[in-house]
Amino acid sequence: MRIVFAGTPEFAAEHLKALLDSPYEIVAVYTQPDRPAGRGQKLMPSAVKALAVAHDIPVYQPQTLRNPEAQAELAALKPDLMVVVAYGLILPQVVLDIPRLGCINSHASLLPRWRGAAPIQRAVEAGDAESGVTVMRMEAGLDTGPMLLKVVTPISAEDTGGTLHDRLAAMGPGAVVQAIAGLADGSLQGEVQDDTLATYAHKLNKDEARIDWNRPAVELERLIRAFNPWPVCHSTLDGESVKVLAANLSTGKGTPGEILSASKDGLVVACGDGALSLTRLQLPGGKALAFSDLFNSRREKFAGGKVLGQ
């Protein structure tokens, strides 16, 4: 089977690795154009491109797949199937129709819940009990196609956006290989999604990471986990930005944002309902540290009565 793979970040690269170890022929890889990265803003290849180059697989990086030239280029590859994972470009219907068996996508949620750009973080933020990977046939709509296969994992009270991402990145590749086998032998037909159950995982916005201490502690604790490692929740103290990477639910009442107490166990801050004990922080110019380490060296900065977010 001739497969074209389309993907960009590390999550997608894990899927490409599995396909390279499978019996299927990867005839080409599509990925986003190189982007400036790092302090020097040097053009850097995507994780998928780097892997493809290492395996001598032809790489295509069109700005769009909407023009006839790019579409003809894809058609010339004569793919049986296109596997799309976190590619980042919209595939018009004419592209979806090119491969003999169509296009399939690995999506990091249990569809139809959390269609869209940030399903992993939105699942943690919402307090979902479970997440997973859905392999589906692609349609012109956003994550709306018939579902071929699902794998499920529980979301623990300690999971962050990062830990859940890594777990799903490990689960998804096997599911894709299994789905391809089912398509090849005709055993997988697909289950139509119930649109009435659909929710949308809107793209993450850095502004969302600014902590609103008027919100309930339960919501903020989930948000802090969901946005770790990116974009990372933050607030201000003494006019300086403070990144909050971990927190636990605590007790106490006060003005939202008020420091209620500080100890090696954490910095307890009042919320709109309840309180949070902040256990891992990053101050400007420093690295992320357990609050116990900051408390030893910067105790005066975290005096009771001070208010975060002002």
Curated annotation (Swiss-Prot):
Any one GO molecular function term: methionyl-tRNA formyltransferase activity
Enzyme Commission number(s): 2.1.2.9
EC supergroup of this enzyme: transferase
Annotated protein name in UniProt: Methionyl-tRNA formyltransferase
UniProt keyword Protein biosynthesis present: yes
InterPro entries named among the record's database cross-references: Fmt, Formyl_trans_C, Formyl_trans_C_sf, Formyl_transf_N, Formyl_transf_N_sf, Formyl_transferase-like_C_sf, GART_AS, Met-tRNA-FMT_C
One Gene Ontology CC term in the entry: cytosol
Protein's job: Attaches a formyl group to the free amino group of methionyl-tRNA(fMet). The formyl group appears to play a dual role in the initiator identity of N-formylmethionyl-tRNA by promoting its recognition by IF2 and preventing the misappropriation of this tRNA by the elongation apparatus.
Pfam family, one: Formyl_trans_N
The keyword Transport appears for this protein: no
Reaction catalysed by this enzyme: L-methionyl-tRNA(fMet) + (6R)-10-formyltetrahydrofolate = N-formyl-L-methionyl-tRNA(fMet) + (6S)-5,6,7,8-tetrahydrofolate + H(+)
HAMAP family to which the protein is assigned, alphabetical: Formyl_trans
Binding site for (6S)-5,6,7,8-tetrahydrofolate: 109-112
Family: Belongs to the Fmt family.
Keywords annotated in UniProt: Protein biosynthesis, Transferase
